[in-house]
Regions:
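Intrinsically disordered, compositionally biased low-complexity regions
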Residues: 1-86
Length: 86
């Protein structure tokens, strides 16, 4: 089963592309994996105007992506509380 990002977990790697997009990588385990290994959860923060949005690769926090693929993955905003009923 793929692990998910833990609350208050800090990213192991950060890529600030151009001042409007920041990628943060959360590895399954920092020992023995590379940036090409599909064991990363990737968070994307994007700024449009004065508003920042936070989204996750494949719309979840599971550690199933390769950090090297961060620019080509599909990102979705996920609810802060997964059991939120609205």
């Amino acid at each position: 089963m793929a692990k998910k990002v833990r609350e208050l977990e800090l990213p192991a790697i950060v890529d600030e592309t151009d001042g409007t997009v920041i990628y943060e990588g959360f590895p399954d385990d920092v020992s023995g994996i590379t940036t090409a290994t599909e064991r990363w959860a990737i968070r994307k923060q994007a700024k449009v105007g004065n508003v920042w949005t936070t989204s996750w690769a494949n719309g979840n926090q599971k550690k199933i992506n390769a950090w090297d693929d961060r620019a080509t993955l599909t990102y979705s905003i996920i609810p802060l509380f997964s059991n939120y009923q609205g």
